A protein has these predicted regions:
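Active-site-adjacent beta->alpha loops and helix N-cap segments on the catalytic face
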Residues: 107-109, 133-145, 163-169, 189-210, ...
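Cysteine-cluster motifs in flexible loop/terminal segments that predominantly coordinate metals
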Residues: 3-72
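Active-site pocket-lining/capping segments in soluble small-molecule metabolic enzymes
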Residues: 77-78, 187, 200-229, 239-244, ...
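N-terminal amphipathic alpha-helix/helix-capping segment at the start of soluble metabolic enzymes
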Residues: 2, 69-101, 105, 109, ...
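Catalytic cores of alpha/beta
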Residues: 164-176, 248-255, 278-281, 302-309, ...
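Short, acidic/polar
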Residues: 105-118, 138-139, 164-171, 246-257, ...
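Hydrophobic faces of well-ordered beta-strands that scaffold small-molecule active sites
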Residues: 96-101, 123-127, 153-157, 182-184, ...
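Active-site mouth loops of central-metabolism enzymes
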Residues: 92-109, 153-165, 234-249, 327-341
Length: 382
């Protein structure tokens, strides 16, 4: 078994590592073959997203995980890219990022037009890759077209859909078309999508992909040792799900991703601000936010149906019962206005929360109109 080396300052390459027996057992049982598990898809009862009858095997092997007790290097890293997102974060601005989902279409002109219209109000557009493990138009193609239209993008890359050979090519290709930011995730298991016969790759997990991105940028070499003629300059992001089990190690896991090379962290949708505050305190204890920036996910709920879906189907969302109950009392034609006002207030509270550097706005069920209605009402970046 091999892991990508994670020591600060080391040459980040594939090196053999001894794996404790209990961790080997967990690796063998994990449907995603996680090397640095557990993933963010664990249900509240501890069951695996790929098999409800399987308790996540990593829950019994937490002490043996290679990323425990991370030592985050002091201070911010040197500038990574020439992008607007990194510049805004370094300047202390509160950034606004809009989530985009590519369509089931070979024509991306509509997507480009809609998000280009949002560009004056957002710092960047985060392009999801095959969301919920269902196929859509290629993320890199959408990014190339949006960058050409003057919209800064964050390209999502999942380990589900590529091995390390393809990952290296895609990282180089992203930089070649003007992408400054990448977001490295393990990816939902294919069983969550609409083609359950598909097989996930999972040659790497999110930790491995983060290290791989940093290796290409910092050592200017591919994993096999070949020197790059022109290395990429990428601002590397990682995911956090603060309210997914095992709760007690989520902040530590984020800190370990920062050690691996993550420059910014984007969370799943958050509603519980007191719990978020406790999570941020834990991140500070690990000094993770001394080096990386935290961007909090905000779901734009515009209907009772959306609220119930989030509450039922999205691990860690913690949609307040009070919000669901309130929407249930509001006529359908007024739920949208209420939801937008609720979201705006939530963003304003996050802006005042120490440790939060921005928000990632999720339009639910393809409702791009909700973004268009919301972002002009936000305070400008400052």
């Amino acid at each position: 078994m091999t892991f990508l080396a994670s020591q600060p300052g080391c040459v980040q390459s594939l090196q053999p590592a001894a794996v404790p027996t209990d961790l080997c057992t967990s690796l063998a049982r994990c449907p995603k073959h996680m090397r640095d598990g557990p993933c963010g898809g664990i249900a509240p009862d501890g069951s695996c997203e790929a098999d409800a009858a399987l308790t996540c095997p990593f829950l019994a092997a937490l002490a043996a995980l290679p990323w425990r007790n991370p030592c985050v290097p002091a201070g911010r890293p040197p500038p990574r890219s020439a992008g607007r997102l990194e510049a805004a974060l370094r300047a202390g601005s509160f950034v606004v990022i809009a989530e985009a989902y590519t369509p089931d279409s070979a024509d991306l002109s509509g997507l480009v037009a809609r998000y280009a219209a949002l560009a004056p109000y957002v710092t960047a557009v985060n392009i999801a890759e095959h969301a919920l493990a269902s196929p859509h138009a290629a993320t890199l193609a959408a990014a190339a077209l949006l960058e050409r239209a003057g919209v800064e993008t964050i390209v999502n890359m999942t380990c589900r859909d590529r091995n390390r050979i393809a990952a290296q090519g895609d990282l180089l290709g992203a930089a070649a078309v003007g992408v400054k930011n990448v977001f490295c995730v393990t990816g939902d298991h294919p069983c969550r999508g609409d083609d359950r016969g598909a097989r996930g790759v999972y040659d790497l997990d999110s930790f491995g992909l983060i290290r791989l991105a940093r290796q290409l940028c910092d050592t200017e070499r591919l994993v096999g040792g070949r020197r790059l003629e022109t290395p990429p300059r990428l601002f590397v992001g990682a995911a956090a799900n603060p309210f997914s089990p095992p709760y007690e190690v989520q902040a530590e896991r984020v800190a370990a991703k920062v050690v691996a090379g993550a420059d910014f962290i984007q969370t799943q949708a958050v509603f519980d601000l007191p719990a978020l505050g406790a999570f941020i305190d834990q991140l500070h204890a690990f000094k993770a936010l001394d080096r990386a920036w935290l961007i909090v996910g905000v779901a734009i709920i515009t209907s009772l149906e959306q609220a119930r879906w989030l509450q039922r189907d999205v691990p860690g969302a913690r949609v307040p019962d009070a919000l669901v109950d309130r929407l249930a009392t509001i006529p359908a034609q007024r739920q949208r206005a209420y939801g937008l006002d609720y979201t705006l207030e939530l963003i304003q509270r996050l802006r005042l929360t120490p440790g939060v550097s921005g928000v990632l706005l999720f339009p639910l069920h393809g409702d791009i109109d909700s973004l268009a209605e919301l972002v002009p009402r936000l305070e400008p970046e400052r």
